[in-house]
Regions:
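Active-site-adjacent structural elements that line small-molecule/cofactor binding pockets in enzymes
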Residues: 1-333
């Protein structure tokens, strides 16, 4: 079983690239280890105000920090051909050996529809993602061996080529999922799983399916990374923590599927319907660091070995200092 690491979730839809890098470096100084950086072409709502290119930011994070780093998550299926994602990822790992992981997901219309193509239903998006992973892994494996490779599939074509800049060890491919079907496929075809905060019994079911898929492929699920991205709201008062959640991260209170919504302005209109009670069971909102510690510990006890924390407010520096002092040292594996 891997040791526990608690990293910083750099939300590039909220903070400009220079500030995101500074905050990640500050987090490491206060005991956080690693960075999960969001890949967005647009923010969730206009008030968030940013959407920088994740690979540029990760390269800068690598220069300023010593922990792991990866996109949380990128979609190798619409805006980006999987060959380009493979090249991005291989280059980052070549720059920072042993530190990079590739987090992928099936995509959301908010970011992916901008190229003007057909936006399929969820099942097809998942199928595209797993074919994209096949292309990425083909490129990784062939390139490590110094060979060319090609692919002709249902969704993607790759003519004979290789990655000419390729690290000795390919970065692990981690898949973001919240459903049991994809969790099983993730165990079978990927190297680890990423998910977000949810009821523990639901995540327990995901882990069961993930383990089932891994064993079918002859892999040990206990040796594969289990990664959590956890949104929370901390401030000096409960009232300010709630205000931060309502204004900065209203999407956290939306109890419906969001993958088909295309515009930050549409999200903004829907956010007007979000009420404080909508965050119940979805995100901890509290001024008490120990309340947050207890919530994080529950996920760690369930089996996560990496947790990336996102405080939804703009009070990042204060939050980093408080959690680095009062929360992280008290978490136990």
């Amino acid at each position: 079983m891997a040791d526990l690491t608690v990293g910083y979730a750099a939300m590039l839809e909220q903070f400009g690239p220079r500030e995101a890098v500074e905050l990640t470096a500050l987090a490491e100084q206060h005991g956080f280890s690693g960075c999960m950086a969001a890949d967005h072409f647009q923010p969730w709502v206009p008030a968030q105000g940013q959407a920088s290119f994740v690979w540029n930011v990760l390269a800068a994070v690598g220069e300023r920090t010593t922990g792991d780093l990866g996109p949380g998550v990128t979609c190798p299926s619409f805006r980006f051909h999987p060959a380009m994602v493979a090249q991005d990822s291989a280059t980052l790992e070549a720059m920072y050996p042993g530190r990079h992981w590739l987090g992928v997901g099936a995509g959301e219309a908010l970011n992916e529809h901008i190229i003007g193509g057909y936006w399929p239903e969820a099942g097809e998006r998942s199928t595209r993602m797993f074919e994209a992973i096949e292309v990425i892994k083909k490129l990784f494996d062939a390139s490590v061996a110094g060979k060319d490779v090609k692919h002709q599939g249902r969704f993607f074509t790759l003519e004979t080529t290789r990655l000419w800049t390729m690290p000795e060890t390919p970065p692990p491919v981690l898949v973001a999922t919240a459903g049991p079907v994809n969790a099983k496929r993730t165990g079978k075809y990927a190297d680890g799983i990423i998910t977000v905060g949810a009821p523990l019994e639901k995540i327990g079911g995901l882990f069961d399916k993930f383990a089932e898929g891994a064993r079918e492929a002859g892999k040990d699920p206990d040796a594969m990374p289990k990664v959590l991205q956890l949104h929370l709201s901390w401030a000096e008062t409960d009232e300010q923590a709630l205000t931060n959640a309502m204004t900065e991260w209203p999407n956290g209170g939306m109890k419906f599927a969001k993958a088909d919504i295309r515009s930050p302005h549409h999200f903004e209109a829907m956010a007007a319907l979000v009420r404080p009670e909508d965050f119940a069971g979805r995100m901890v909102i509290s001024a008490d660091p120990d309340v947050h510690r207890a919530e994080i510990q529950r996920y760690v006890d369930l089996g996560f070995d990496r947790v990336y924390l996102h405080n939804v407010g703009r009070n990042q520096r204060e939050w980093i200092e408080v959690f680095g002092r009062d929360v992280l040292p008290k978490l136990q594996r």
